[in-house]
């Protein structure tokens, strides 16, 4: 069973997302028309899928691999340099090269950024192997590496040629990673009331990992993101900002833990709860709404407990570095109801007062 949908960005060529019930890498062969292929993956995914992927490629391709360490802390300049050096050392050229990102969000982000900047842009293909990367980071063209002062601070908007994935990847996905991915899925439920109702009615099948339901879940999640990206590919109008619900708080959590604590999706889960509480604090929603929204998150096995190893001062400083901020104004994605999120400006003092009473 294959599900296919199209992403139509504002400024870039359209491309397909292919969601497969089985894992069949041959589906990307039509997109590997270049003669030089560099497969970027990590040590964990390489052991599981690299051999199978390489076996699917045709014989006349010049195929090389670049295997990085696994973890958010390796989404770094050093890892980027390793990819670029591999390309240069093997004389890969702009018009004959395609990069393949075989892995989760870290691999997709860093490979996409390498593709964006190598010789001013080369083709790349996304093969996301985690639920989180399937529904979020592989779609929409955001590519980046982290800086010691903030997450995703060095990056570019750069779209792939195609996204191919399969729910068969879940067979080797740790339960913790699966639940982390569910946080991004649940985020879309707050953007779309229809999807909120669909998730609510299919919760048991999702938690049981029913294959037909999971394909539909991934497809619907990607459709929501694709619709937003089509309106505002490069965050010029503000429409795309709603995709960052939970991320302002979540990114600050990751930064404070040096990217070695909560997984990205876990941090987003906590971040959504923080954004909900902040919305209640500002009078945008009632106490009952805040409880219902947070209960919905938790019902999918997602923890919303704020880490107790983060000091408020450090957390506040991390939030001040958020990319949405401008002219020292803090910007947050806040909720007024299911399907009603908005980008709002708030003062540093307002945030400090909220943090004081919420800890």
From Swiss-Prot:
Pfam family, one: DHQ_synthase
Enzyme class: lyase
Biological role: Catalyzes the conversion of 3-deoxy-D-arabino-heptulosonate 7-phosphate (DAHP) to dehydroquinate (DHQ).
CDD domains: DHQS
Residues reported to bind NAD(+): 70-75, 105-109, 129-130, 142, 151, 169-172
Catalytic reactions of this protein: 7-phospho-2-dehydro-3-deoxy-D-arabino-heptonate = 3-dehydroquinate + phosphate
Cofactor: binding details: Binds 1 divalent metal cation per subunit. Can use either Co(2+) or Zn(2+).
Name of the protein in its database record: 3-dehydroquinate synthase
Binding site for Zn(2+): 184, 247, 264
Any one GO molecular function term: 3-dehydroquinate synthase activity
Gene3D superfamilies given in the database record: 3.40.50.1970, Dehydroquinate synthase-like - alpha domain
Keyword annotations of the record: Amino-acid biosynthesis, Aromatic amino acid biosynthesis, Cobalt, Cytoplasm, Lyase, Metal-binding, NAD, Nucleotide-binding, Zinc
InterPro entries xref list: Dehydroquinate_synthase, DHQ_synth_AroB, DHQ_synth_fam, DHQS/DOIS_N, DHQS_C
PANTHER family to which the protein is assigned, alphabetical: 3-DEHYDROQUINATE SYNTHASE, 3-DEHYDROQUINATE SYNTHASE, CHLOROPLASTIC
Required cofactor names: Co(2+); Zn(2+); NAD(+)
HAMAP family: DHQ_synthase
The organism's place on the tree of life at top rank: Bacteria
The enzyme's E.C. designation: 4.2.3.4
SUPFAM superfamilies per record: Dehydroquinate synthase-like (SSF56796)
Gene Ontology BP, a term: amino acid biosynthetic process
Localization annotation: Cytoplasm
Gene Ontology CC: cytoplasm
Entry's family note: Belongs to the sugar phosphate cyclases superfamily. Dehydroquinate synthase family.
């Amino acid at each position: 069973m294959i599900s296919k949908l199209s992403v139509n960005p504002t400024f870039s060529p359209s491309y397909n997302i292919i969601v497969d019930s089985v894992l069949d890498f041959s589906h990307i062969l039509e997109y590997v028309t270049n003669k030089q292929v560099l497969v970027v993956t990590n040590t964990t995914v390489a052991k599981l899928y690299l051999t199978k992927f390489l076996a699917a490629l045709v014989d006349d391709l010049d195929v090389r691999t670049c295997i990085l360490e696994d973890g958010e802390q390796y989404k770094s300049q050093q890892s980027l340099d390793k990819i670029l050096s591999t390309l240069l050392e093997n004389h890969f050229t702009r018009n004959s090269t395609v990069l393949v990102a075989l892995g989760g969000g870290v691999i997709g982000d860093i490979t996409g950024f390498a593709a964006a900047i190598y010789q001013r842009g080369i083709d790349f293909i996304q093969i996301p192997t985690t639920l989180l990367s399937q529904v979020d980071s592989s779609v929409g063209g955001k590519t980046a590496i982290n800086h010691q002062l903030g997450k995703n601070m060095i990056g570019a908007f750069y779209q792939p040629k195609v996204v191919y994935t399969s729910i068969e990847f879940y067979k080797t996905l740790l339960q913790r990673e699966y639940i982390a991915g569910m946080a991004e899925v649940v985020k879309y439920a707050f953007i779309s009331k229809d999807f909120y109702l669909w998730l609510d009615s299919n919760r048991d099948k999702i938690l049981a990992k029913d294959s037909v339901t999971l394909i539909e879940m991934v497809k619907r999640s990607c459709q929501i993101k694709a619709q937003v990206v089509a309106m505002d590919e490069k965050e010029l109008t503000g429409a795309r900002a709603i995709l960052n619900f939970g991320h302002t708080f979540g990114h600050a959590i990751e930064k404070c833990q040096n990217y070695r604590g909560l997984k990205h999706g876990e941090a987003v889960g906590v971040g959504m709860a923080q954004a909900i509480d902040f919305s209640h604090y500002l009078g945008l929603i009632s106490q009952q709404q805040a409880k219902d929204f947070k209960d919905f998150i938790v019902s999918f096995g997602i923890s919303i407990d704020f880490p107790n190893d983060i000091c408020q001062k450090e957390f506040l400083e991390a939030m001040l570095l958020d990319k949405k901020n401008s002219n020292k104004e803090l910007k947050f994605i806040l909720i007024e109801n299911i399907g009603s999120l908005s980008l709002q400006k708030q003062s540093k003092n307002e945030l400090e007062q909220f943090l004081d009473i919420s800890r």
